[in-house]
């Protein structure tokens, strides 16, 4: 594992949480001084196995990532004017380092989402979550200590011209080399009567994305689900589905052999993503299907809004409610479950099975 987690092993500790992984270098260390600013404000972040980051906040006014910036190493100042895409990327490791970047890295490590040699299709819907995920993955790929490849995949399920233009414009602004392919999903969902259009749309989207990603030689697709999605889904399954289950950080595809789905923003809170978008003056696409344009409320969206409201209300009495919901799914005690299944295809087991076995002993 040295090749993956490098510095963590040498420091004798496992990088278990997003916070607390970094050490501040002493400015007096000549080898780590910034020649552009004389060592003022140099900070060396040691992010085990995912690329070292040196951020200079001194008079040099430049940022060197992984120590690989030639201009910075040789003492030449880089142009201070950065593109919107560069500013958005830089903000991930500066202003939003704790709230976004560290949590993104923490999720990738804790759940082993990315491995050497992976070819990952980042699936971009045009919303804030997937767009920010794409920038995180782009930055990580540049400075990771092990090689992996990334494709930026956009499916057009029937967007209106203005909505598609918004996605393309944001991709240009963020300097994301997207691949766009088309599917008839909106038209199909629009004609289906009854059932949940959001559920059907999500299932069809995933199938098309798996298929296109596999055709590009990818072994994983990355989706933009975040911390809030996880806890809201957990509550929805209990209150609306009469079962206890959650959104996993990764899973194997059942219909596409060798393919996996990963959720690198698993530990990132939605408020951080919203703030990042506003900070960089970005406007993202909302749900743009024809069904929701004609309907004031639809079942799944309404239920999710209700979960947001419920969690916010409970947090007024206990500020740790959200993290406790999240952690509860990491600490399930099956011995206290009246009934359980070990997967969607498994039969329902009762606590009486083992209870009666103990009586016979």
Where are these regions (language model features)?
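Short, basic, helix/turn surface patches
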Residues: 202-216, 250-256, 309-328
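Basic/polar N-terminal segments that are highly enriched at the extreme N-terminus
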Residues: 72, 78-79
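Catalytic subdomain that performs nucleotidyl-dependent activation
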Residues: 149-150, 228-310
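ATP-dependent adenylation/nucleotidyltransferase module used to activate substrates
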Residues: 10, 79-244, 248, 271-279, ...
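Functionally engaged cysteine thiol sites
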Residues: 1, 52, 197-204, 287-296, ...
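Short, low-complexity intrinsically disordered segments enriched in small and basic residues
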Residues: 2-38, 44, 49, 53-69
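The feature marks non-catalytic terminal segments
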Residues: 282-361
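A structural signal for well-ordered alpha-helical scaffolds and beta->alpha junctions
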Residues: 97, 101, 164, 206, ...
């Amino acid at each position: 594992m040295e090749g993956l987690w490098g510095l963590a092993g040498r420091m004798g500790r496992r990088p278990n949480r997003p916070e607390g992984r970094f050490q501040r270098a002493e400015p007096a260390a000549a080898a780590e001084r910034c020649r552009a600013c004389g060592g003022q404000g140099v900070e060396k972040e040691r992010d085990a196995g995912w690329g070292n980051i040196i951020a200079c906040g001194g008079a040099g006014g430049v940022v060197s990532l992984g120590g690989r910036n030639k201009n910075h190493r040789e003492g030449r100042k880089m142009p201070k004017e950065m593109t919107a895409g560069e500013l958005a990327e830089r903000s991930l490791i500066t202003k939003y380092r704790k709230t976004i970047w560290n949590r993104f890295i923490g999720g990738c490590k804790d759940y082993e989402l990315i491995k050497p040699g992976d070819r990952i299709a980042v699936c971009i819907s045009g919303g804030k979550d997937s767009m920010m995920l794409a920038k995180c993955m782009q930055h990580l790929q540049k400075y990771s200590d092990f090689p992996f490849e990334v494709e930026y995949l956009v499916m057009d399920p029937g967007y209106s011209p203005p909505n598609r233009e918004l996605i393309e414009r944001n991709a240009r602004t963020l300097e994301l080399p997207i691949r766009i392919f088309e599917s008839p999903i909106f038209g199909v969902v629009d004609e289906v009567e009854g059932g949940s259009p959001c559920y059907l749309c999500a299932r069809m989207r995933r199938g098309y994305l798996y298929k296109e990603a596999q055709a590009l030689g990818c072994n994983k697709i990355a989706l933009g689900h975040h911390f809030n999605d996880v806890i809201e889904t957990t509550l929805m399954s209990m209150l609306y589905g009469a079962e206890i289950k959650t959104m996993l950080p990764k899973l194997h595809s059942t219909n596409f052999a060798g393919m996996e789905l990963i959720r690198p923003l698993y530990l990132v809170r939605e408020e951080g993503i919203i703030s990042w978008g506003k900070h960089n003056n970005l406007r993202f696409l909302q749900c743009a299907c024809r069904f929701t344009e004609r309907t004031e409320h639809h079942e799944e969206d309404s239920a999710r809004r209700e979960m947001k409201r419920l969690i916010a209300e409970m947090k007024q009495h206990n500020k740790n409610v959200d993290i406790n919901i999240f952690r509860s799914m990491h600490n399930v005690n099956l011995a206290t479950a009246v009934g359980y299944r070990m997967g969607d295809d498994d039969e329902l087991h009762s606590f009486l099975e083992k209870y009666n076995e103990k009586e016979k002993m």
